[in-house]
From Swiss-Prot:
SUPFAM superfamilies, alphabetized: Acyl-CoA N-acyltransferases (Nat) (SSF55729)
Pfam families attached to this UniProt entry: Acetyltransf_1
GO molecular function: acyltransferase activity, transferring groups other than amino-acyl groups
PROSITE patterns on file: GNAT
Superkingdom to which the source organism belongs: Eukaryota
Protein's name in the database: Uncharacterized protein F36G3.2
Native species: Caenorhabditis elegans
Domain N-acetyltransferase: start-end pairs: 6-152
Cross-referenced InterPro entries: Acyl/Acetyltrans_Enzymes, Acyl_CoA_acyltransferase, GNAT_dom
Function, as annotated: To the C-terminal of C.elegans F21C10.9.
Length: 313
């Protein structure tokens, strides 16, 4: 193994050039689960912690990083990433060990490992296996066509919600995932790359929430649909139908990705997409250092938000 020279840096400022280099590599790696809202919010989230290896040059360029978010007694590790030319040279083990030493002892470590890394992560720090994440990809036009025969509901763009309606959305989100994510949702919906819709029943009560956000490089024109929380399977399909129309109007040439977990009501949508003969790919396996019981109401989770800035499922 050739010797590699680098420096260690912890918790760089949100405006550091390292974050731009990190985002570019995340998008280039094709980690579509880590959408543009994740890469936009992570640098400035109060919960973000990070350890970096940087080059021993005046530029201090990106070599590698471990990035996690601390909240609700969990350290959710969203990124363990090395520049390609530094892989297999021992840098990863060094920054991993430093990161592990920085995490509170009373917190559970959680992460989603790509299939090739699951065994390694289980042996290192996270032996408890949780949900598996699969993704289904289709054209927006195909998505819209598959939904045209379904009925819709009274809906409203999240960007058009009144303050009272947004408060109701925060409560609905909390009921589903068992966490108060107000601060995160407020930041999430300020991003230009995010689009969201809620469905109301006849009493103007929220019965579904669905969102989309760009993922990967902008020129790839790919959107990740997440979350989809809904009161029932029929309402979930109504939300998908409504949202297909919104997406088709705004981004008719785009691709959409649905990352589904094998918990909650994810199996319902897995069956639906398989009926369309879409072959899924496994994005990752959820791993924890300790037992981590699910909170909230899993029956309403058709698509998890799957955002490491504030983990839901």
């Amino acid at each position: 193994m050739s010797e590699v020279s680098y420096d260690i840096l912890e918790n760089p400022e949100p405006n550091s050039h390292l974050w731009k280099q990190w985002k570019n590599l995340v998008d280039t790696e094709g980690w579509t689960s880590d959408d543009n809202s994740v890469t936009a919010l992570t640098p400035s989230m109060p919960s973000t912690r990070s350890v970096w290896a940087v080059s021993k040059t005046a530029e201090n360029d990106f070599v590698g990083c471990v990035i996690w978010n601390e909240y609700n007694k969990i350290c959710f590790l969203g990124f363990f990433l090395l520049a390609p030319e530094y892989r297999g040279k021992g840098v990863g083990s060094v920054i991993w060990d430093i990161a592990m030493s920085r995490m509170p002892a009373d917190h559970t470590l959680g992460l989603r490992g790509v299939p090739s890394m699951v065994d390694k992560y289980r042996k290192k720090a996270t032996p408890f296996v949780g949900a598996t994440l699969e993704n289904y990809k289709m054209k927006v036009a195909e998505y819209h066509a598959s939904m045209e025969k379904m009925t819709g509901d009274n809906f409203k763009l999240v960007s058009h919600l009144t303050p009272v309606e947004f408060d109701q959305l925060v409560r609905y989100d909390s009921d589903v995932n068992g966490r108060n994510r107000r601060e995160f949702l407020e930041l999430y919906y300020k991003l230009d790359c995010v689009l969201g819709v809620v469905l109301f029943d006849q009493h103007h009560k929220i019965i579904a929430h669905i969102s989309a956000v760009r993922t990967s490089h902008k020129e790839d024109n790919v959107f990740k649909i997440a979350p989809l929380y809904a009161d029932s399977p029929s309402i979930a399909m109504s939300a998908l139908r409504v949202f297909s129309g919104v997406m088709f109007e705004l981004h008719p040439e785009a691709d959409v990705l649905f990352h589904l977990l094998d918990v909650g009501s994810g199996a319902f949508l897995q069956s639906f997409f398989q009926s369309l003969e879409i072959i899924p790919a496994v994005s990752g396996v959820t791993l924890f250092s300790n037992e981590w019981p699910n909170k909230g109401d899993l029956s309403k989770v058709f698509i998890a938000h799957n955002n490491s800035c504030h983990f839901d499922y």
